């Protein structure tokens, strides 16, 4: 696999940040692959939910009324034990959720996990945002090679 500078940016975030991480970029440039490779190669426990492929995960994001309900649904969908303070929760294709940004703020603020989100065309698709996650989200743009 080619080395990508963003890998080092992800590493710095993982080691030093208490915010969520959002990798934003065009479709099919390797966002999911780079995140999965980083987590796997560093032996980091993680779960992955793809909101485009998993309609139950999308429904969890769209219909949960608070972060506790959303975390309950995420844990049910994970098919593995989620360990507080250890498991990274990776939500792929976050742009599919109708208001993805608002739950991100409350998840990062109140849940004892690290969150990584990835998506495409987020600036175009995001609307009806109820609460902007200022200070709760690190955004890393990713570009094609």
Task: For the regions a language model picked out, list residue spans one by one.
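Phosphate-binding site recognition
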Residues: 1-145
């Amino acid at each position: 696999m080619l080395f990508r500078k963003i890998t080092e940016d992800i590493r710095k975030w993982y080691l030093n940040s208490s915010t969520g991480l959002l990798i934003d970029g065009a479709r099919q440039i390797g966002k999911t692959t780079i995140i999965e490779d980083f987590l796997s190669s560093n032996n980091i426990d993680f779960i992955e939910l793809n909101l485009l492929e998993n309609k139950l995960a999308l429904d969890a994001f769209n219909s949960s009324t608070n972060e506790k309900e959303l975390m309950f649904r995420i844990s049910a969908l994970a098919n593995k034990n989620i360990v507080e303070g250890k498991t990274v929760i990776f939500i792929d294709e976050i742009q599919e959720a109708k208001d993805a940004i608002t739950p991100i703020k409350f998840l990062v603020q109140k849940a004892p996990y690290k969150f990584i989100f990835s998506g495409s065309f987020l600036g175009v698709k995001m609307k009806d945002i109820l609460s902007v996650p200022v200070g709760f989200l690190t955004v890393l743009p990713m570009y094609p090679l």
